[in-house]
């Protein structure tokens, strides 16, 4: 009996030790890995996420968060450090890219308009010594071309748990709105980014990618734009975007309407896209209305 009791006590002590070790390890390393490539590894600290502002919607008992803050971390390979130093224009401060190991930043996120702002950022060497730091940065809207999009999605998911990160990484993130081929063999394909879709009153707002190829299959035009489609009225407007053409590279997009709404003509490929957007908004109402406060 004494041996059984002693064995049980030892097992209990061992289990307590293992549990305590796990807790200590978690406390020492608050970072959760998000992704890595040959230049960067991205992490965020879930325990650091907090709501700093919220609003109460009519006929709802719980407030909706409108501003979040959190800490993020980026570690660098030599190539990533070199690129970062160049982008920040700090070669006079960090002369050797090999010394830049990682950066920690505090960011503020605005879920309703997919905005992320750096409040502060500090660069470190491998030993944890500060190499350089900066204060508040500009606001950046998150889309498929944004370096910080994974940070944004992970932070928002901590509060809302709507699957922002999963949708961003999904194979069907982009859906075809419409495609068309002219008699000359020129093909146009327009796709919409479901991860950016949100409803604001009658408008469905999202980022779209338009690609035009000639009869030989060469890409002759690309448009990447944020647009608002008024679903009941069947109108749309370009909010912002960029345009690419061979020899010209990427430029700011000028749609010729100066941001005004235009009617989507009937019996056109664009109307097929409108019908698909209406169906999507009806079928995925929870998704397009997430975080909504209007």
PLM regions and their residue ranges:
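N-terminal secretory-pathway/extracellular module detecting exported/lumenal segments
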Residues: 24-225, 229-294
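C-terminal segment of classical bacterial N-terminal signal peptides
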Residues: 14-23
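Bacterial N-terminal signal peptides that target proteins for export
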Residues: 1-10
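N-terminal leader/targeting signatures
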Residues: 10-14, 276
């Amino acid at each position: 009996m004494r041996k059984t009791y002693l064995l049980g006590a030892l097992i209990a002590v061992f289990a307590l030790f293992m549990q305590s070790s796990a807790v200590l390890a978690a406390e020492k390393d608050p970072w959760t890995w998000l992704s890595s490539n040959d230049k960067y590894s991205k992490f965020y600290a879930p325990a650091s996420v907090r709501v700093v502002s919220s609003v109460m919607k009519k006929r709802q008992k719980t407030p909706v968060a409108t501003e979040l803050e959190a800490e993020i971390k980026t570690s660098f390979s030599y190539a990533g450090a070199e690129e970062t130093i160049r982008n920040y224009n700090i070669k006079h401060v960090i002369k050797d890219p090999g010394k830049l190991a990682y950066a920690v930043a505090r960011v503020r996120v605005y879920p309703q308009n997919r905005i992320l702002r750096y409040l502060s950022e500090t660069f470190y060497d491998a030993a944890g010594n500060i190499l350089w730091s900066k204060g508040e940065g500009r606001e950046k809207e998150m889309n498929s071309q944004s370096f910080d999009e994974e940070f944004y999605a992970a932070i928002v998911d901590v509060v809302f748990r709507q699957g922002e990160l999963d949708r961003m990484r999904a194979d069907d993130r982009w859906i075809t709105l419409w495609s068309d081929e002219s008699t000359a063999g020129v093909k146009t394909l327009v796709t919409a980014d479901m991860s950016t879709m949100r409803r604001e009153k009658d408008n469905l707002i999202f980022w779209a990618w338009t690609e035009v190829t000639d009869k030989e299959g060469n890409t002759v035009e690309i448009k990447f734009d944020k647009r608002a489609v008024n679903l009941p009225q069947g109108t749309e407007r370009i909010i912002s975007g960029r345009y690419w053409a061979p020899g010209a590279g990427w430029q700011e997009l000028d749609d010729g309407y100066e941001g005004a709404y235009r009617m989507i003509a009937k019996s056109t490929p664009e109307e097929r896209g409108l019908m698909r957007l209406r169906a999507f908004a009806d079928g995925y109402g929870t998704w397009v209305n997430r975080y909504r406060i209007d």
